[in-house]
């Protein structure tokens, strides 16, 4: 029996980190809709999800954003931030850094107040050293 090697090439739409994405795929897993969650529980979960993304760049941006803004966000803004965290890590990173050539900004995020706040923080106008905030 002969073994044949087959080379598979995955197209990645210019994103070196993400697997190819098919928007029409029926295999999409919908985010969990949490009900009955207190504001404090939600904030604690969002802090955790902001810090434990798996990609250092996203961890730094999102954990600093959470530390700076979570306490002052309204309930609707917390919901919007929760929805943003359901997006893929590299997409959030590229949107936050306004690198739309790599990952175009979807229409659903074009008027996002939270994304605009995240983009402003990502500019780091104060030139702070980026590190994970203390818990």
UniProtKB/Swiss-Prot annotation:
Pfam families: Sdh5. Signal peptide: none annotated. Keywords: Chaperone, Mitochondrion. GO terms for cellular component: mitochondrial matrix. It is found in: Mitochondrion matrix. GO terms for biological process: mitochondrial electron transport, succinate to ubiquinone; mitochondrial respiratory chain complex II assembly; protein-FAD linkage; tricarboxylic acid cycle. This protein may be expected to contain an N-terminal transit peptide but none has been predicted. Plays an essential role in the assembly of succinate dehydrogenase (SDH), an enzyme complex (also referred to as respiratory complex II) that is a component of both the tricarboxylic acid (TCA) cycle and the mitochondrial electron transport chain, and which couples the oxidation of succinate to fumarate with the reduction of ubiquinone (coenzyme Q) to ubiquinol. Required for flavinylation (covalent attachment of FAD) of the flavoprotein subunit of the SDH catalytic dimer. Interacts with the flavoprotein subunit within the SDH catalytic dimer. Belongs to the SDHAF2 family. This is Succinate dehydrogenase assembly factor 2, mitochondrial. It comes from Meyerozyma guilliermondii (strain ATCC 6260 / CBS 566 / DSM 6381 / JCM 1539 / NBRC 10279 / NRRL Y-324) (Yeast).
């Amino acid at each position: 029996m002969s073994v044949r090697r087959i080379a598979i090439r995955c197209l990645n739409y210019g994103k070196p980190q993400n697997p190819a994405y098919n928007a029409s795929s029926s295999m999409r897993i919908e985010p969990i809709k949490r009900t009955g969650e207190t504001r404090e529980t939600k904030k604690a979960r969002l802090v955790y999800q902001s810090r434990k993304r798996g990609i250092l760049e996203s961890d730094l941006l999102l954990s600093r954003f959470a530390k700076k803004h979570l306490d002052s966000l309204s309930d609707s803004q917390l919901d919007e931030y929760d929805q943003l965290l359901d997006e893929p890590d590299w997409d959030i990173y590229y949107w936050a850094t306004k690198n739309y050539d790599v990952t175009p900004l979807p229409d659903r995020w074009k008027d996002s107040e939270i994304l605009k706040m995240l983009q402003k923080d990502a500019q780091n106008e104060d030139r702070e050293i980026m590190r994970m905030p203390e818990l």
